[in-house]
């Protein structure tokens, strides 16, 4: 057992436009090289495009639904037993779920062709909202991998 105390969770204030902590975390993940104003401009622009294309009144509700659709429930973790390494399916913690969903959305938005991140992010959010696209495929692949290794579920720790 570690003698050190558990690190305290840093409290993130909500973003200035919508007052959402989740959106501020998303902005922090989009940010590169400490350029937060650029990250905010990208995210807010993408949210406006997203809401306009889907005809939503409140872009924040649509964003939260898209994020919810991208969250994984199960994942596999490597567990060494004897000389063999098994992929053991485990349930994903709530904080990690949202973190993984955000990472996947941003990764697939950046990999979309074209120069503008704002457009790519808006398109990826629309795909997540409609339960299709690369992020949802990644989530389904993660679930499929966990389902395939269900036989090793008794190796949980």
Swiss-Prot record:
PROSITE patterns (alphabetical): RIBOSOMAL_S7
Keywords: Ribonucleoprotein, Ribosomal protein, RNA-binding, rRNA-binding, tRNA-binding
Listed GO biological process terms: ribosomal small subunit assembly; translation
Molecular function GO labels: mRNA binding; rRNA binding; structural constituent of ribosome; tRNA binding
Keyword Ribosomal protein: yes
Lineage: superkingdom: Bacteria
Cited Gene3D superfamilies: Ribosomal protein S7 domain (1.10.455.10)
InterPro entries: Ribosomal_uS7 (IPR000235), Ribosomal_uS7_bac/org-type (IPR005717), Ribosomal_uS7_CS (IPR020606), Ribosomal_uS7_dom (IPR023798), Ribosomal_uS7_dom_sf (IPR036823)
Keyword Transit peptide in annotation: no
GO cellular component, as recorded: cytosolic small ribosomal subunit; ribosome
Family: Belongs to the universal ribosomal protein uS7 family.
PANTHER family, sorted: RIBOSOMAL PROTEIN S7
Subunit structure of this chain's protein: Part of the 30S ribosomal subunit. Contacts proteins S9 and S11.
Functional note: One of the primary rRNA binding proteins, it binds directly to 16S rRNA where it nucleates assembly of the head domain of the 30S subunit. Is located at the subunit interface close to the decoding center, probably blocks exit of the E-site tRNA.
Protein name (record): Small ribosomal subunit protein uS7
Native organism: Chlamydia trachomatis serovar D (strain ATCC VR-885 / DSM 19411 / UW-3/Cx)
């Amino acid at each position: 057992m570690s003698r050190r105390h558990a690190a305290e969770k840093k409290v993130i204030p909500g973003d200035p436009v919508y007052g959402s902590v989740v959106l501020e975390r998303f902005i922090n993940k989009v940010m590169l090289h400490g350029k937060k104003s650029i990250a905010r401009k990208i995210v807010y622009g993408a949210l406006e495009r997203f809401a306009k294309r889907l005809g939503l009144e409140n872009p924040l509700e649509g964003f939260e639904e898209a994020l919810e659709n991208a969250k994984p429930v199960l994942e596999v973790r490597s567990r060494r037993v004897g000389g063999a390494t098994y992929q053991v399916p485990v349930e994903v913690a709530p904080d990690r779920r949202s973190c993984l969903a955000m990472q996947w959305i941003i990764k697939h938005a950046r990999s979309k062709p074209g120069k503008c991140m704002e457009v790519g992010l808006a398109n990826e959010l629309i795909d997540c909202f409609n339960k299709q696209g690369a992020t949802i495929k990644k989530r389904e692949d993660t679930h499929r991998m966990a389902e395939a290794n269900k036989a090793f579920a008794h190796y949980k720790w």
